[in-house]
Amino acid sequence: MSIRIAIAAAAALLTQEAAAPRMVVIDGEAVKRDEPPPHGNIGMSTAYRYSDAVPGRAMEFRKRVLHVGAAIGAHKLAHDEVYYVLSGEGEAFSGDRTAPVKAGQAIYFFDGETMGIRQKGAQPLALIISYPLAVRARAR
């Protein structure tokens, strides 16, 4: 009987280790890097790739600061995306629509649209970007 209990306990422990954790806390400085923005390498940006370190995640969550003159170039979406403007000003576009954006606004981009966003003005454009993954990331 005690062998069965030990086997069951070991199996439960292995299952817990293979599953995604209940919570992950990520320090922004640990995931910060300067790089050209995606989709065209237009200018420079500072990327905070928060969700990259999260095992078993189902979504991306990032902060990107577009330096003066930088842009995330036009690209067709395979999912919905939300961009939240933390600071600065920019111009978002989707299909044939263009709109100015500023701090405190969110832009909801839809699956199948071709979209992008560019920094405008004297200050960098700081964004939070979130979207679902097509396939859940592997648990580590």
Predicted regions and their residues:
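Ligand-binding loop in jelly-roll beta-barrel domains
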Residues: G56, D111-R136
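Short acidic-glycine-tyrosine-enriched beta hairpin
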Residues: R97-G112
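Glycine- and acidic-residue-biased ligand/ion/polar-headgroup-sensing regions
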Residues: A78-G90
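A short, N-terminal "cap"/entry segment at the start of jelly-roll beta-barrel domains
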Residues: L13-A58, R138-R140
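Short beta-strand segments in beta-sandwich/barrel cores
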Residues: A70-I72, G88-F93
